[in-house]
Amino acid sequence: TQGTALLGDLSRDLKDEENPDDFTAVTLCLDGIGVVVNKDSAVEDLTPDQITKIFTGEISNWSEVGGEDAPITVVGREAASGTRDGFESIFDVKDKAKYALELQETGLVVSKVASDKNAIGYVSLASVDEEKGIKAVKVDGIEATEENVANGTYTVQRPFVQIYKKGSTDPLIKAWFEFLASDEGQQIIADKGLVPQEIEVPNN
């Protein structure tokens, strides 16, 4: 809001206290958030209610959701993480989640879940790779795939948004969004495991 940058990045919508009417927001793509467990876990599918209760500590043993008789290790990101903000908003666990570990990077979450057969966490869908020792569970029977993010059936997702000051006439802003809307720009987004969206280019 102080005009120190042409563009701002968000992985959520602007909040009322952030003066959304002062900005134009452009959704670049959608990112699924995978709810991940160890690749050898017997758990393949969880309901949103089960996920909520696991992260708030109401469910604390895998046997309660069809897994082995073992305590659940709940792993999350640090408080400033956009992935954490998105996940906690979707499952309504802000200020309620009880983490055994809060980690600074996606890679650390992946490593912890891969090394602990009783762990559960969340990461951007692009980071889910069974070769790294983790897998994303289905949510209400829906697989965590880019296709299901795009068609809206996999609802654990968040937007990647860029904002700029409403009424800005800086040619760099227009050129940037023209590039992102081009075939090359859209392919770069898709190559990152994200779901491209139709990008509205400023006409100033």
What residue spans do the PLM features occupy?
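Exported/periplasmic ABC-transporter solute-binding proteins
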Residues: 1-204
